[in-house]
């Protein structure tokens, strides 16, 4: 895009007020990091789901650490992430196709994505009105219906020791919200000033 002149053209359109915001879509943390280094994007469409975050699936590009580092950087730099592939093309919703061999619900997948740093919205695929009605039910779903802590019972071995803020380890004997503490810690390590105040 840089050598072709497309980026310069988009920048010109933004300066003229024709383009209000510049965003991009990618499945690769490395590609997005390079775009962030240019300081031009304000929005990112990125594939986030438990399968991809744990290197399971066609678009599972980058390690868990690389992906989390990208989410944290986007949050720190004010680049909103719109999530695509939240259900991994439906694979996570069926035990037969799930890389975990257990099905998750749509609500669990949506909440999982929303809980990642930098995420501002999830764009689930809608095929018909029934899908739309079901997805809108997320807004009325109970915390139990959104809870994805079951992931802690079947995530791959490579994920051990990496907190994904699911609170599967709860209840803490000391009454601490372990997921939230780890989230603030991760944000603080990434340089988020607000998180440092909380941590």
Q: What is each model feature region?
A:
Residues 65-199:
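Structured C-terminal cap/extension of enzyme domains
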Residues 1-82, 87:
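Glycine/proline-rich, positively charged
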């Amino acid at each position: 895009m840089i050598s072709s002149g497309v980026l310069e053209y988009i920048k010109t359109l933004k300066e003229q007020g024709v383009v209000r915001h510049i965003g991009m879509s990618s499945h690769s943390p490395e590609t997005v990091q390079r775009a962030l280094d240019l300081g031009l994007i304000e929005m990112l469409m990125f594939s986030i789901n438990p399968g991809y975050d744990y290197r399971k699936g066609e678009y599972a590009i980058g390690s868990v650490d690389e992906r989390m580092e990208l989410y944290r950087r986007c949050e720190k730099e004010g680049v909103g992430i719109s999530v695509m592939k939240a259900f991994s093309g439906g694979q996570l919703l069926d035990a037969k196709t799930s890389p975990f061999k257990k099905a998750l619900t749509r609500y669990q997948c949506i909440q999982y994505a929303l809980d990642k740093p930098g995420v501002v919205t999830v764009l689930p695929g809608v095929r018909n009105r029934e899908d739309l009605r079901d997805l809108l039910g997320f807004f009325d779903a109970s915390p139990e219906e959104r809870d994805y802590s079951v992931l802690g019972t079947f995530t791959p071995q490579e994920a051990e020791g990496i907190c994904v803020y699911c609170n599967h380890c709860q209840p803490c004997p000391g009454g601490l919200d372990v997921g939230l503490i780890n989230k603030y810690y991760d944000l603080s390590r990434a340089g988020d000033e607000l998180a440092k105040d909380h941590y």
